[in-house]
C-alpha cells in the first residue's frame, strides 16, 4: 500500500491523498475554522452594536434639530402673540364691530403695528382682518415690506384667499410654510385677536385676526447648521392636508443639500407602514438602519417630529449607508486580514511539523511493503529451534497452536536450512513460508473478517494477555506495553533461542528509538514487530477458516436454491400474466389478417388495444417495483389536505363500488384533521390508498363493505421512532386522540355491525340530491368532486361513444384515474383555503407540529390465512398461490405500498381473519405547516366524510315505475354462488340512455332465436336480448357497461357483464357464469362440437374466432373447471359428447388439471383434451400430460399450431376436412 501521491491523478474515489497532506489540512482547517468562528462572532456582535449606536446617534441628532426648530418658531410666535394681544388692536376691532368704521378708529392700532414692524428686521408686513376675514388695516415695514412681490404676498396671506382654513385659527392660529422670495425665505403667522368689551361677560371672543409676514432665515440657519453631524444630510418635511383635514402627503420645507430649489413645491404621497406615516399621524420618532424612501440610494436616518402646535413638521437627519457602516466595514477588514495572516502562519508552521510527525508512519509503511512483497521470515538457524521459539512466543502471547502442527515441526528437527545472500531461499520439507504466493494468500486471508461459525471454532486458551482476533491477527489492544517491551528485550538478548531473521526481515523490522514519551505510535511499532512473528501461527488458523468458509458456502448454496425456487415461481406467474394479453394481441392480429370485414377487423383492433393497455399496466407495476428496489424513487413533498385524499378516493372508487354493489365508506376523524395543511408527498399517499382500496374492492363480494378511515392519532415522537429505526410509528404520551370514533349513531346511520359506522356513498349521493341546506364547505367539496369526476371519466365516456363499444377500455379505474388524481391534487384547491387570490393554502401556524395519521382500509372479503399475512407484502406473492386462485395479479401492489410507506418513515400492517375480512393500516408521520379556518362557515364539516353528518342518513324515495326507472335500477350481476341466472350490469351513463327493455340472458328461448348470422341475429336484435360472455380477470378492470346499442354477430362479441370494474390481473375470473352456446342449428349432427374452457374473455374470443376460421361453428364456452365438468356431464347424460376440449390450466374454483382428472375419472370421457396455458415450461407440460391431457397448446395461440392440434387429435375435423 502506497501512501505517497500517485504518479497520475485518479479521478474516481477513493482519491489518494498523503497522510502528510491530510494532517496539514486537518490542522489548518481546525485552526482556520476556530479563527473564522471567533471572527464571525466578534464581527457580527460588534457590527450589530455599531449599527445600534449610530442609529441612536442619528435619532438624537434629529431630536436636537427638531428642538432647535421649535425654539425658533416659539420665539417668533410669542412676538406675534404680543402684537395680537395689544389693547389698541382690541379696542379698534371692538369699535369697528360696534359700527365705528371711520379712519380715526384705526390711528392708534396703526401706530402700534408700525412700531412693532420697525423694531425688528424679522417682520415685514402686518394685516388686520375682522371676524369675517375682511382686511381692515394693512401696515408694512418701509425698509422691506414694500419689496415683496404680489404672488408671494398671495401665498403668505391665507386669510385673503378662498382656501379652506384649519380650525386651529380660531384658537391658537396658523403658520404657513416658508416661501422663497428671490434669495430669502418668508413665512406668515396668523393669530386670532380676542377681546371682551363687556364688564358683565367673563369670556373673550374672537373679534378679528392678524397676519404677520416674517423672515424664515433664522429657521433656514438652523436647517443649514450641520455642526457635529459628519457627512449627514438634514431635511424638514411638512404634512399636506386634504379637504377632509387628513394628512395625505408631504413636501420639503427647505430643499435638502444638493437638491433642486423647486423641490419644496412638489408634494409626495404618504405610504402606510412607513416612518413618515408614523411621525405625522402618531407623533413618534425613531431611526432606520436602511431605507431609500427619501433618496435613490440606501441611507440610515433618524427622525423626530416638531412639537410646535402651529405646524406638523418632522426633522430628519440621514447618512449614506457607506458612511453609516464605515466603522463596521473597517472592523471587518481588520478581522479578515488578521484571520488570513494567522492562517498563512499556521499552514507554514504545520508543513514541517507534519513532515516530522509522519516519519514513523512512513517507516511502518515501508516495512509493510517489504512483507507484502514476500521478503522476510527466512530462518537461518535450524528450523526446529526457530519454530519452537516462535511457538513459545505464541503461547506466551496467548496463542493456541494445533498439536498436529507441533508434531509436524518436531518431526522435522533434523532438517536444516541454508541461506545464500540477500535473496537466498530456504529449503525444507513442507515449509510453507518460502513461497511468495503462500505469504500473500496468508496476508490476504488475514485481512478478511472471520464468519460467525469461526467464533464457535475459536481455539480456547488460558491466557488473557492477548487473543487471536476475528480476522486472524493479534489483538494487541489487550497487550500491555510492559509485556511488549519485555518480549522485545528478550528477543534482542537471547537471539540464539528465538526466531532469527534474514537480511530482508531485518529491514522489515522497525528500529526501536529511545523516546521521551510512550504513545500509541510506539505501541503500534512494537505490535508490528510482534506481528511478523505471529505470521507462523496464522497458518494454523487457515484450516479452521477453510472449514468455516465451507459451512458458509453450504448455507449460501441452500439460500441460492431457495432463491432459484422463488425465481421459478415468479417466472411461472409473470409468464402467465404477460402471455395472456400477448395471446389477445397476437391472436386477434392473426385473425384480423384473415378477415376482410371492416367491422370485424375494427372489433379485433379494440381487443388488441385493450390487451396492450393491460400489458402496459403489468409492465408499469414491474418497473415501479424495480425503481423502488433500486431506491430511485424520490418523494415530492408539498402542502396538501387530508380531505384531498378522501375526495380522490371517492371520485375514483365511488362509482366503481356502486356498480359492483359494494358499500364504500370514507370517514375522517376527528374534524380537526380537516383544518390541517400537511407537508408530504400526497401523490404517493394517494397511490398507496388507491392500491389498498382497489385490493379491497377486488376481494370484496357483492353486497360487501369497504371502510376507509382516516384518523388523527396524536403527535409524532420522532426521537423514539428514530431510535427504533422507524420500525414503528410512536406517539408522544399525553397527545393521543382518545375519543372513540365508533360512537352511538344519532342519525340512525346504516351500520356494518353493532359498533361500526359506515358512510354509504350510494346513500350519500341520494342525500346530496335531496338536501338543499348544504353548507358552504360542502358546496366547495362537491364542486371539486364534480371536476375530478368529470376529468376522470370523460375519456372513458368519450371512448365509449366514439367506438360504439359495449365494453370500456381495459385501462383500469385505478390506473387511468391515478394520473388524473395526481393532476387534481396538484391543481385543485382544498375548501376553506382562501386561495382564490393566488395565496398559499391556509395560514401559517406559529408552532408547527408533526402528527401521526392513520389510514385504515377494512373489507369484508375472504380474509388471509395467518401464515400468509406477512408474506403477502413480499414481491410476487399473493394470498392464493394455487393454479385455481380466483384472483390474479402480479403480486406487487402490497409490496409497493410497504416500500412507499417505509420511504415515508411509516408502517403498513395487516389484520385479517379468514371468512371475516382484512384490515390494512397505513400509519405515517406528517408535518403540519398551516391551518385552514372555517370560522365563516356555519356547518363546515357537514359532508359525507363525517359519520355524524345529516348527509349520511339513508333516505328512501318512492319513484313511479317507468321504462327509464326500470332501466336505471336494472339488475346487476349475480354472485359467484349462483351461476344459473345472469343479469346485466349497466353503468349509470348507459342506463340513462337506454330505451329498451332488457331481458334475462338465461331465457330458454335464446337458443332458438340465435339461428344464423342474419335471421337469428335480427330476431335477437328486435327483442333487444344481450348475450353475456364470461368475464375474466383481464376484463375485470373494464367498466360495468351494457349499452343499449346492438352488436351484430359479425363483431363476434356480445355485451359483457362485469363483476368488478377495476383492474385485476389476467387469466383469473371472479365468478362462474352460464355461457350461451355459439352454435348453428342448421349444421348436421356430425359437425365438430368443441368445448373451450377458458376464464379470460379475450382468450375465449381468440380461440373461438380461430376455430371459426377453421370452419368450426359449434363451440361452447366455460369459465372454469367446475363449469366444464358440469357441461360434459350434462352432454354425456344426453348420449352426446364433445369431439375435443380445450382446457386452460390456471382457472378459478377448479383449475384445469383437477378438472381433467375429474372428467376422465368420474365421467369416463375419452375424447382428446388439449391444455391451454401461458406457462410453457417442460415441467408444466409433463404435469398436464400426467393429469390426463392429450396435447399442449401454449399461449399466445398461433393458427398453424391450432390447426396441427385439430388435425392430430380431432378425427371429426379430419373427416370434415376430407369431405370438403
Swiss-Prot record:
The modification Phosphoserine is found at residues 502, 758, 833, 1041, 1044. InterPro entries: CheY-like_superfamily, HAMP_dom, HATPase_C_sf, His_kinase_dom, HisK_dim/P_dom, HisK_dim/P_sf, Sig_transdc_His_kin-like_C, Sig_transdc_resp-reg_receiver. It is a multi-pass membrane protein. Keywords: ATP-binding, Cell membrane, Glycoprotein, Kinase, Magnesium, Membrane, Metal-binding, Nucleotide-binding, Phosphoprotein, Transferase, Transmembrane, Transmembrane helix, Two-component regulatory system. It is an enzyme of class 2 (transferase). It holds the Pfam family HATPase_c. Residues 47-333 are extracellular. GO terms for biological process: osmosensory signaling via phosphorelay pathway; phosphorelay signal transduction system. Residues 1-22, 355-1220 are cytoplasmic. Signal peptide: none annotated. It is found in: Cell membrane. Residues 573-928 form the Histidine kinase domain. It catalyses: ATP + protein L-histidine = ADP + protein N-phospho-L-histidine. GO terms for cellular component: cell periphery; plasma membrane. The chain crosses the membrane at residues 23-46, 334-354. Glycans are attached at residues 100, 138, 142, 181, 224, 272. Residues 965-984, 1063-1075 have a biased composition (Polar residues). It comes from the Eukaryota. Residues 414-433, 444-500, 960-1016, 1040-1081 are annotated as: Disordered. GO terms for molecular function: ATP binding; histidine phosphotransfer kinase activity; metal ion binding; osmosensor activity; phosphorelay sensor kinase activity; protein histidine kinase activity. Mg(2+) binds at residues 1094-1095, 1144, 1195. Residues 451-468, 988-1000 have a biased composition (Basic and acidic residues). Its EC number is 2.7.13.3. Present with 656 molecules/cell in log phase SD medium. Histidine kinase that acts as an osmosensor at the plasma membrane. Part of the bifurcated SLN1-YPD1-SKN7/SSK1 two-component regulatory system, which controls activity of the HOG1 pathway and gene expression in response to changes in the osmolarity of the extracellular environment. Under normal osmotic conditions, the histidine kinase autophosphorylates His-576. This phosphate is subsequently transferred to Asp-1144, from where it is relayed to 'His-64' of the phosphorelay intermediate protein YPD1. Under high osmolarity conditions, the histidine kinase is no longer active. This is Osmosensing histidine protein kinase SLN1. It comes from Saccharomyces cerevisiae (strain ATCC 204508 / S288c) (Baker's yeast).
Amino acid at each position: 500500500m502506497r501512501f505517497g501521491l500517485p504518479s497520475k491523478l485518479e479521478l474516481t474515489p477513493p482519491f489518494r491523498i498523503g497522510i502528510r497532506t491530510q494532517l496539514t489540512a486537518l490542522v489548518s482547517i481546525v485552526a482556520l475554522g476556530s479563527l473564522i468562528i471567533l471572527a464571525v462572532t466578534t464581527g457580527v456582535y460588534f457590527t450589530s452594536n455599531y449599527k445600534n449606536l449610530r442609529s441612536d446617534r442619528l435619532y438624537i441628532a434629529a431630536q436636537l434639530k427638531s428642538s432647535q426648530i421649535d425654539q425658533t418658531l416659539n420665539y417668533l410666535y410669542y412676538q406675534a402673540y404680543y402684537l395680537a394681544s395689544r389693547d389698541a388692536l382690541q379696542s379698534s376691532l371692538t369699535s369697528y364691530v360696534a359700527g365705528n368704521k371711520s379712519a380715526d378708529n384705526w390711528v392708534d392700532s396703526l401706530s402700534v403695528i408700525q412700531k412693532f414692524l420697525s423694531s425688528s428686521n424679522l417682520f415685514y408686513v402686518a394685516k388686520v382682518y375682522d371676524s369675517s376675514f375682511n382686511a381692515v388695516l394693512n401696515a408694512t415695514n418701509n425698509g422691506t415690506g414694500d419689496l415683496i412681490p404680489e404672488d408671494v404676498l398671495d401665498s403668505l396671506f391665507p386669510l385673503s384667499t378662498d382656501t379652506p382654513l384649519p380650525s386651529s385659527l380660531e384658537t391658537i392660529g396658523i403658520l404657513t410654510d416658508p416661501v422663497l422670495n428671490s434669495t430669502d425665505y418668508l413665512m406668515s403667522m396668523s393669530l386670532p385677536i380676542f377681546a371682551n368689551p363687556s364688564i358683565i361677560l367673563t369670556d373673550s371672543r374672537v373679534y378679528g385676526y392678524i397676519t404677520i409676514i416674517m423672515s424664515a432665515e433664522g429657521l433656514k440657519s438652523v436647517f443649514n447648521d450641520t455642526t457635529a453631524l459628519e457627512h449627514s444630510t438634514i431635511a424638514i418635511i411638512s404634512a399636506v392636508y386634504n379637504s377632509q383635514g387628513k394628512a395625505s402627503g408631504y413636501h420639503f420645507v427647505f430643499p435638502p443639500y444638493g437638491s433642486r430649489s423647486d423641490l419644496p413645491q412638489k408634494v409626495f404621497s404618504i405610504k402606510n407602514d412607513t416612518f413618515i406615516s408614523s411621525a405625522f399621524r402618531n407623533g413618534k420618532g425613531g431611526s432606520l438602519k436602511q431605507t431609500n424612501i427619501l433618496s435613490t440610494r440606501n441611507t440610515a436616518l433618524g427622525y423626530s417630529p416638531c412639537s410646535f402646535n402651529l405646524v406638523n413638521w418632522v426633522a430628519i437627519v440621514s447618512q449614506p449607508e457607506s458612511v453609516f457602516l464605515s466603522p463596521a466595514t473597517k472592523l471587518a477588514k481588520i478581522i479578515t486580514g488578521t484571520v488570513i495572516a494567522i492562517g498563512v502562519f499556521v499552514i507554514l508552521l504545520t508543513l514541517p511539523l507534519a513532515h516530522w510527525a509522519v516519519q514513523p508512519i512512513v517507516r511502518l509503511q515501508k516495512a509493510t511493503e517489504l512483507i507484502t512483497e514476500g521478503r522476510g521470515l527466512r530462518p537461518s538457524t535450524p528450523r526446529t529451534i526457530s519454530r519452537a521459539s516462535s511457538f513459545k512466543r505464541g503461547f506466551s502471547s496467548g496463542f493456541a497452536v494445533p498439536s498436529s502442527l507441533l508434531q509436524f515441526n518436531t518431526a522435522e528437527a533434523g532438517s536444516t536450512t541454508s541461506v545464500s545472500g540477500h535473496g537466498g531461499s530456504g529449503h525444507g520439507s513442507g515449509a510453507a513460508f518460502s513461497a511468495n504466493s503462500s505469504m500473500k494468500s496468508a496476508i490476504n486471508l488475514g485481512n478478511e473478517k472471520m464468519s460467525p461459525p469461526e467464533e464457535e471454532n475459536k481455539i480456547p486458551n488460558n491466557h488473557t494477555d492477548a487473543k487471536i482476533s476475528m480476522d486472524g491477527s493479534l489483538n494487541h489492544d489487550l497487550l500491555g506495553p510492559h509485556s511488549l517491551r519485555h518480549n522485545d528485550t528478550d528477543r534482542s538478548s537471547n537471539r540464539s533461542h528465538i526466531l532469527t531473521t534474514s537480511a530482508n526481515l531485518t529491514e522489515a523490522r522497525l528500529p526501536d528509538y529511545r523516546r521521551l514519551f510512550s504513545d500509541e505510535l510506539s505501541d503500534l511499532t512494537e505490535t508490528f514487530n510482534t506481528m511478523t512473528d505471529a505470521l507462523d501461527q496464522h497458518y494454523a488458523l487457515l484450516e479452521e477458516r477453510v472449514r468455516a468458509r465451507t459451512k458458509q458456502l453450504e448455507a449460501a448454496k441452500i439460500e441460492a436454491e431457495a432463491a432459484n425456487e422463488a425465481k421459478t415461481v415468479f417466472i411461472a406467474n409473470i409468464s402467465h400474466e404477460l402471455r395472456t394479453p400477448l395471446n389477445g394481441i397476437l391472436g386477434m392480429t392473426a385473425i384480423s389478417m384473415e378477415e376482410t370485414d371492416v367491422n370485424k377487423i375494427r372489433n379485433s383492433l379494440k381487443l388488441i388495444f385493450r390487451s396492450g393497455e393491460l400489458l402496459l399496466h403489468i409492465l408499469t407495476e414491474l418497473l415501479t417495483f424495480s425503481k423502488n428496489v433500486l431506491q430511485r424513487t424520490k418523494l415530492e413533498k408539498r402542502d396538501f389536505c387530508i380531505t384531498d385524499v378522501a375526495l380522490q378516493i371517492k371520485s375514483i372508487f365511488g362509482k366503481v363500488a356502486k356498480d359492483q354493489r359494494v358499500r364504500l365508506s370514507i370517514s375522517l376523524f376527528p374534524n380537526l384533521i380537516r383544518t390541517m395543511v400537511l407537508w408530504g408527498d400526497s401523490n404517493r399517499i394517494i397511490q398507496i390508498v388507491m392500491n389498498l382500496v382497489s385490493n379491497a374492492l377486488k376481494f370484496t363480494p357483492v353486497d360487501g363493505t369497504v371502510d376507509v378511515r382516516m384518523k388523527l392519532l396524536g403527535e409524532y415522537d420522532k426521537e423514539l421512532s428514530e431510535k427504533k429505526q422507524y420500525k414503528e410509528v410512536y406517539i408522544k404520551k399525553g397527545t393521543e386522540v382518545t375519543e372513540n370514533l365508533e360512537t352511538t349513531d344519532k342519525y340512525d346511520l346504516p351500520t356494518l355491525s353493532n359498533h361500526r359506522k359506515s358512510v354509504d356513498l350510494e346513500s350519500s349521493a341520494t342525500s346530496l340530491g335531496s338536501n338543499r341546506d348544504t353548507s358552504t364547505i360542502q358546496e366547495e367539496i362537491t364542486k371539486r368532486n364534480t371536476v375530478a369526476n368529470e376529468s376522470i371519466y370523460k375519456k372513458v365516456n368519450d371512448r365509449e361513444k366514439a367506438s360504439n363499444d359495449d365494453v370500456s377500455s381495459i385501462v383500469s379505474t385505478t390506473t387511468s384515474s391515478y394520473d388524473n388524481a395526481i393532476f387534481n391534487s396538484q391543481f385543485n384547491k382544498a375548501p376553506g383555503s382562501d386561495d382564490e387570490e393566488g395565496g398559499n393554502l391556509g395560514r401559517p401556524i406559529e408552532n408547527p407540529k408533526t402528527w401521526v395519521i392513520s389510514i385504515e382500509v377494512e373489507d369484508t372479503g375472504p380474509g388471509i390465512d395467518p401464515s400468509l399475512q406477512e408474506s403477502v407484502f413480499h414481491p410476487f406473492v399473493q394470498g392464493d398461490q394455487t393454479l385455481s386462485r380466483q384472483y390474479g395479479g402480479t403480486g406487487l401492489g402490497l409490496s409497493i405500498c410497504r416500500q412507499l410507506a417505509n420511504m415515508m418513515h411509516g408502517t403498513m400492517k395487516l389484520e385479517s381473519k379468514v371468512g371475516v375480512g382484512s384490515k390494512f393500516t397505513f400509519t405515517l408521520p406528517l408535518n403540519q405547516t398551516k391551518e385552514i379556518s372555517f370560522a365563516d362557515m356555519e356547518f363546515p364539516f357537514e359532508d359525507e366524510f363525517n359519520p355524524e353528518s345529516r348527509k349520511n342518513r339513508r333516505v328512501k324515495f318512492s319513484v313511479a315505475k317507468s321504462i327509464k326507472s326500470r332501466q336505471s335500477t336494472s339488475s346487476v350481476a349475480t354472485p359467484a354462488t349462483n351461476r344459473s341466472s345472469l343479469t346485466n350490469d349497466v353503468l349509470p351513463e348507459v342506463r340513462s340512455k337506454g330505451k329498451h327493455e332488457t331481458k334475462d340472458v338465461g331465457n330458454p328461448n335464446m337458443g332458438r332465436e340465435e339461428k344464423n348470422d342474419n335471421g337469428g341475429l335480427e330476431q335477437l336484435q328486435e327483442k333487444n336480448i344481450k348475450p353475456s360472455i364470461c368475464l375474466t380477470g383481464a376484463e375485470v378492470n373494464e367498466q360495468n357497461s351494457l349499452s343499449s346499442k346492438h352488436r351484430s354477430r359479425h363483431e363476434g362479441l356480445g355485451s359483457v357483464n362485469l363483476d368488478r370494474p377495476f383492474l385485476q390481473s389476467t387469466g383469473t375470473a371472479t365468478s362462474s357464469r352460464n355461457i350461451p352456446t355459439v352454435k348453428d342449428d342448421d349444421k348436421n349432427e356430425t359437425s365438430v362440437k368443441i368445448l373451450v374452457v377458458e376464464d379470460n374473455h379475450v382468450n375465449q374470443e381468440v380461440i373461438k374466432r380461430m376455430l371459426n376460421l377453421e370452419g368450426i361453428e359449434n363451440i361452447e364456452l366455460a369459465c372454469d373447471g367446475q363449469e366444464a365438468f358440469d357441461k360434459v356431464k350434462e352432454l354425456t347424460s344426453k348420449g352426446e359428447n364433445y369431439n375435443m376440449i380445450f382446457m386452460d390450466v390456471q382457472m378459478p374454483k377448479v383449475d384445469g388439471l383437477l378438472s381433467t382428472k375429474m372428467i376422465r375419472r368420474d365421467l369416463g370421457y375419452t375424447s382428446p383434451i388439449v391444455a391451454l396455458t401461458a406457462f410453457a415450461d417442460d415441467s408444466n407440460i409433463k404435469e398436464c400430460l400426467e393429469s390426463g391431457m392429450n396435447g399442449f397448446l401454449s399461449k399466445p395461440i398461433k393458427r398453424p399450431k391450432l390447426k396441427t392440434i385439430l388435425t392430430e387429435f380431432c378425427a371429426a375435423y379430419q373427416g370434415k376436412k376430407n369431405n370438403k
